[in-house]
């Protein structure tokens, strides 16, 4: 392993001395006023016979580039809706290995006889399909004005949320969500809160990667969702603000502000958001305990639980980019997130005999107050050597999480005549800290004959310290509960290196990659525990893995493209899931960690066909070994909810994604995914074999009218599915919105109704360990929301999509408090 790691590191260092042979033609497209023209079509022709070589489009800054162009003489044409076509002078590109930058191509507006009857719009499509990712261009949809990041995600193809706000991509959980290439370090509930406070106006693109390249951390069996925020390079001061008032059963106001200032060589930005969130969660659970024959009912457990949650969250991010030269940038970013959650739970449990006669009643009021304080510091460096694309980047990160949870549980038992039979009171005090240190560097270099090299290394160190102090309260005197009090220490080090090589043939693009990751970790449990936990134990583990990736893209013609990709990935358990503590929900239901969790490994294969940027058809297959997910283990009368390895998961499916402008004012976007999922393995001494064929439908209708009016009708529906031991019933939701631009299109108002028919209520059941259980959920999901968004200062130009963090996989593995309402 050491030799391999040294070899890959040496490759990174040696690459800096390789000569460049990048045949490249670059330039810009602007209008008569010198303003950049985005999404202009630029075509390269051979001068000799006027045959077309290649076509591309300009970015937000009007830039375009043609890579790996053979020596010769060429012509360029540039066009855009609302402009006449312009041609370049002849281009002599006979110097091998040179990069030729042509003078700006200036588009002049044509003469239009009746402008009142004609409106020209040149923009990117809402959804773009690339060989290795799906790109959501947020600004391409006018109805995204006044929306949040979560709103855009929920209508993105293949993205769904479960009852706990866990994000899935194409039916698979454990997706890594990143902001500007940086994992969020947040629990599903905290992440959902943050995404709802992040305005869509601050987002440039959302990238959906089901099979990321070797450049990315190998973690995340279902891939990566990367949210790229806008970053203004225009001199002066500008910003945006977003204010939302949502009303369901409880009010959910939120607000955010994004500020940017550039003067000279320094660029400053400040982003903040606050949401005093309130909500509810109604949970009904019925368990039928069966005899050994698996049919005869022995007893029945019926529980109705109401949870009220108040969860004010605050996030802040400040950064500086200093442009040492036109090629070199230094950056500093500091960010923080504070989440103070308070849950008040009322649980009423009926214990029944097989004939449904009442045996006893247990009433369990409880409170849980949890505070999370997350902070992160990042230093970053970027140097572009030349226009050919040679680049070096580096990141240093430190992240710290502090949490404190105080719990109170009161269990009162009554007879059917409501005579009090007993009472037990338990309190808990659970402090915890997580420290993450990472360093990474990436190097990109175009080579001769159409090759491109990417390579890099990453080091990460993590340590966690979690304690659980529980006390039994008898006659108002607290006694230490030694069977539950515990402390858990965890250490982890991951060393990684990767190399990617890309080759462009005439119609075929090939990218091959290999990532090596060496993982070393240890855990030490002090004190006492139950179930899978020993009284005092420790473990040390180490393993080395190789993660190959391969991408093949073949362009049949201007309208048809074929892609095939393969990748191997890993998912490591969240740090808290390795912690053997018990978290009490009520007298009969616990949550627990599992120090024996093993990482899971996934093989992904995808093949797709894209037609005219309109229809994309994809076939996929994945196989996961040592798959871990939420499991349920019955121990006497107690149901223990913990993450466990359940064996294997297989998934095969076909998806169709299409977008089409039905009229000049109506665009429809359809996504459908039909997939088969099977879970099989040995779990808690019993064979598990469960499967289902599921259909996911997502339809989004966008309307753009005159005078700044717009609208949207969207919805999704998912048929019966499976998730580990649980069979999921069908569910979906329908939403609608209307928008109006005001203040000369610098601001907008949006009125939205979410979950109109209140159908987003996931239900499920499981049949395992001689137990039949049904679970029904209801949350505060039907909402009416009014949003005001305002962009002030100079218009956003020159977006720099580069994120500032190297702490990728490590951040996504932090789980924290959150009710998921």
Question: Where in the sequence are the language-model features?
Answer:
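Outer membrane beta-barrel strand-and-loop segments of large Gram-negative receptors
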Residues: 427-428, 436-440, 481-486, 598, ...
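Short, acidic Ser/Thr/Gly-rich low-complexity loop/linker segments typical of extracellular
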Residues: 47-63
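Short, acidic, small-residue-rich periplasmic hinge/interaction motif at the N-terminus
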Residues: 41-45, 79-81, 97-142, 162-164, ...
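Short acidic/polar hinge/loop motifs at secondary-structure boundaries
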Residues: 93, 183-210
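Outer-membrane beta-barrel signature, preferentially recognizing the C-terminal barrel domain
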Residues: 486-494, 541, 570-618, 623, ...
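Surface-exposed extracellular loop regions of Gram-negative outer-membrane beta-barrel proteins
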Residues: 520-522, 527, 558-604, 619-637, ...
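Outer-membrane beta-barrel translocator/receptor signature
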Residues: 218-225, 233-284, 310-315
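N-terminal periplasmic accessory domains that precede
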Residues: 104-106, 149-152, 191-193, 208, ...
């Amino acid at each position: 392993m050491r030799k391999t790691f040294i070899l890959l590191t040496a490759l990174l260092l040696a690459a800096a001395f390789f000569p460049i042979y990048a045949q490249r033609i670059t330039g810009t497209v602007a209008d008569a006023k010198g303003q950049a023209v985005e999404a202009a079509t630029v075509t390269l022709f051979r001068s000799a016979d006027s045959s077309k070589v290649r076509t591309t489009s300009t970015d937000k800054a009007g830039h375009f580039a043609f890579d790996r162009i053979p020596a010769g003489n060429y012509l360029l044409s540039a066009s855009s809706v609302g402009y006449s076509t312009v041609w370049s002078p002849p281009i002599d590109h006979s110097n091998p290995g040179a990069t030729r930058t042509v003078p700006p191509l200036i588009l002049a507006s044509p003469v239009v006889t009746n402008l009142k009857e004609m409106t020209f719009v040149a923009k990117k499509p809402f959804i773009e399909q690339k060989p290795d990712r799906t790109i959501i261009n947020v600004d391409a949809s006018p109805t995204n004005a006044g929306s949040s990041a979560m709103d855009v995600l929920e209508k993105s193809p293949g993205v769904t949320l479960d009852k706990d706000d866990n994000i899935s991509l194409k039916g698979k959980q454990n997706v890594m969500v990143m902001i500007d290439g940086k994992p969020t370090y947040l629990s599903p509930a905290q992440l959902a809160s943050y995404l709802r406070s992040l305005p869509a106006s601050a987002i440039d693109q959302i990238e959906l990667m089901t099979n990321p390249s070797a450049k990315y951390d190998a973690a995340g069996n279902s891939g990566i969702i990367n949210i790229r925020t806008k970053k203004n390079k225009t001199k002066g001061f500008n910003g945006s603000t977003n204010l939302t008032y949502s009303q369901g059963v409880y009010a959910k106001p939120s607000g955010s502000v994004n500020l940017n200032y550039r003067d000279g060589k320094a660029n400053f930005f400040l982003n903040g958001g606050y949401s005093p969130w309130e909500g509810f969660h109604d949970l009904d659970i019925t368990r039928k305990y069966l005899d050994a024959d698996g049919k005869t009912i022995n007893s029945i457990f019926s529980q109705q639980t109401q949870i009220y949650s108040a969860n004010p969250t605050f996030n802040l991010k400040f950064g500086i980019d200093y442009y040492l030269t036109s090629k070199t940038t230094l950056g500093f970013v500091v960010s923080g997130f504070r989440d103070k959650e308070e849950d008040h739970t009322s649980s009423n449990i009926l214990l029944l005999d097989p004939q449904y006669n009442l045996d006893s009643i247990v009433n369990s009021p409880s409170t849980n107050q949890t505070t999370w304080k997350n902070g992160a510091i990042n230093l970053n460096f970027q140097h572009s050597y030349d226009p050919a694309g040679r680049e070096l980047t580096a990141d240093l990160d430190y992240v710290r999480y502090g949490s404190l949870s105080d719990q109170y549980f009161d269990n009162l038992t009554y007879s059917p005549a409501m005579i009090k039979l007993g009472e037990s009171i338990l309190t808990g005090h659970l402090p915890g800290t997580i420290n993450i240190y990472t360093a990474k560097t990436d190097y990109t270099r175009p080579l001769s004959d159409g090759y491109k090299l990417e390579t890099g290394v990453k080091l990460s160190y993590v340590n966690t310290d979690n304690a659980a102090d529980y006390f039994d309260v008898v006659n108002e005197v607290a006694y230490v509960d030694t069977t539950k009090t515990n402390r858990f220490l965890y250490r982890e080090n991951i060393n990684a290196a990767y190399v990617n090589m890309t080759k462009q043939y005439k119609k075929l693009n090939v990218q091959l990659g290999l990532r090596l990751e060496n993982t070393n970790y240890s855990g030490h449990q002090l004190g006492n525990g139950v179930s899978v936990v020993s009284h005092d134990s420790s473990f040390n583990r180490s393993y080395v893995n190789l993660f190959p990736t391969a991408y093949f893209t073949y362009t049949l013609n201007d309208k048809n493209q074929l892609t095939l990709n393969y990748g191997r990935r890993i998912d490591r358990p969240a740090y808290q899931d390795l912690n053997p503590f018990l978290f009490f929900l009520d007298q009969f239901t616990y949550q627990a960690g599992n120090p024996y969790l093993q990482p899971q490994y996934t093989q992904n294969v995808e093949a797709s066909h894209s037609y005219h940027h309109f229809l994309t058809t994809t076939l996929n297959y994945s196989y996961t070994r040592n798959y871990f997910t939420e499991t349920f283990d019955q121990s006497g009368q107690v149901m223990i909810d913990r993450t466990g390895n359940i064996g294997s998961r297989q998934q095969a499916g076909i998806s169709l994604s299409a977008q089409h402008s039905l009229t000049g004012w109506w665009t429809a976007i359809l996504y459908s995914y039909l997939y088969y999922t099977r879970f099989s393995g040995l779990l808690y001494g019993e064979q598990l074999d469960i499967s289902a064929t599921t259909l996911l439908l997502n339809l989004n209708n966008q309307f753009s009218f005159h005078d700044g009016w717009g609208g949207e009708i969207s919805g999704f529906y998912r048929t019966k599915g499976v998730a580990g031991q649980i069979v999921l019933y069908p569910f979906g939701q329908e939403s609608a919105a209307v928008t109006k631009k005001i203040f000369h299109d610098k601001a907008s108002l949006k009125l939205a109704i979410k979950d109109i028919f209140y159908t987003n209520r996931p239900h499920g059941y499981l049949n395992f360990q001689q137990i039949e259980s049904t679970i029904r959920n209801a949350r505060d999901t039907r909402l009416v929301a009014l949003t005001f968004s305002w962009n002030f200062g100079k218009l956003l130009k020159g977006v720099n999509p580069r994120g500032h963090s190297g702490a990728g996989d490590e951040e996504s593995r932090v789980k924290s408090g959150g009710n998921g309402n």
